[in-house]
A protein has these predicted regions:
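A basic, amphipathic helix-loop patch mediating RNA/tRNA/ribosome contacts
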Residues: 1-48, 82-83
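Conserved class I S-adenosyl-L-methionine
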Residues: 79-89
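Conserved S-adenosyl-L-methionine
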Residues: 96-104
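A short glycine-rich, Lys/Arg-flanked "PGG" loop and its adjoining helix->strand segment in the class I
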Residues: 158-175
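Short, glycine-/aromatic-enriched active-site segment of Class I SAM-dependent methyltransferases
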Residues: 180-197
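Flexible, glycine-/basic-rich loop-and-beta segments that form/coincide
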Residues: 234-272
Length: 272
């Protein structure tokens, strides 16, 4: 099965429109199986290795595209706010926050030396590397957090929400990447750490909703990430609002979102 290169870029989150995809291809930064391809209509195998080299996606990493989608579908903006990027890595989410008006971003990650140099040297960024979010307390910060994102691996959201509850403003909002491979029981995770069953995705999202509500967050929106994980995992974006009276998502929304995700992404190639 083959697919047009520009269509592939759109489906996998490299570009937000066909025109943007064509521009990337024509600029000479798109490589298929290590070979530069400059024709948007080039037909490629669905399992081909596709790379967009350079920062022409607009952010230091493709992670920024996940937050970009969240801001398109949920009523959340970082303009003028103190923000936190939990699981910052190279800083795609941080970059997206700054691009959209954040006044300060605390970039938190257990790793070291990963944050892009352009962000490391930006006076609006507080680089909290070598920091486990589970150990962060309000007195470690100079501010309350009004806008946050979560993109972490090998840790469940049940460990994130209790901390967010203590460091956020009363009206804070956030978007959490729900990764089934790190939430589901081991018996439900397949080869290479991939969760494929819609029933497991549904179960995980109900669990994530419970974690949020138990820590004073209302799950106020849900969608699927435009980018699959490296091994092909479908991941989800959950929009939350800090609240003393948390409410669940509308009935049936979790099931519908899972169905929409599988319809859109089951045949999409994995991200490389």
């Amino acid at each position: 099965m083959k697919i047009r290169l520009d269509q592939y870029l759109c489906q996998n989150g490299y570009a937000q429109s066909r025109e943007r995809a064509k521009a990337l291809i024509m600029s000479g930064i798109v490589f298929v199986n290590e070979q530069k391809v400059d024709k948007a209509g080039e037909m490629i195998a669905e399992d081909a290795k596709v790379e967009v080299r350079g920062h022409d996606i607009g952010y230091v990493s493709r992670g920024g595209l996940k937050l970009e989608k969240a801001m398109q579908v949920f009523p959340m903006r970082p303009d003028g706010k103190v923000c936190m990027d939990i699981g910052a890595s190279t800083g795609g989410f941080t970059d997206c926050m700054l691009t959209n008006g954040a006044v300060k971003v605390y970039a938190v990650d257990v790793g070291y030396g990963q944050l892009a140099w352009s962000l490391r040297t930006d006076e609006r960024v507080v680089n909290m590397e070598r920091t486990n979010i589970r150990n962060v307390t309000p007195d470690m910060l100079g501010d309350k957090i009004a806008f946050f994102s979560v993109d972490v691996s090998f840790i469940s959201l049940k460990h994130i929400f209790p901390v967010a509850d203590t460091i956020c403003t009363p009206d804070a909002v956030g978007v959490c990447l729900v990764k089934p491979q790190f939430e589901a029981g081991r018996e439900k995770v397949g080869k290479k750490g991939v969760v494929r069953e819609p029933a497991t995705h549904t179960e995980v999202l109900h669990m994530a909703q419970g974690y949020a509500m138990a820590n004073h967050f209302t799950p106020a929106g849900l969608d699927f990430s435009p980018i699959k994980g490296p091994e092909g995992n479908i991941e989800f974006l959950m929009y939350v609002q800090h609240s003393q009276n948390p409410q669940p998502l509308p009935e049936g929304l979790i099931e519908q979102t899972v169905a929409n995700a599988h319809a859109a992404l089951d045949k999409a190639p994995n991200l490389h």
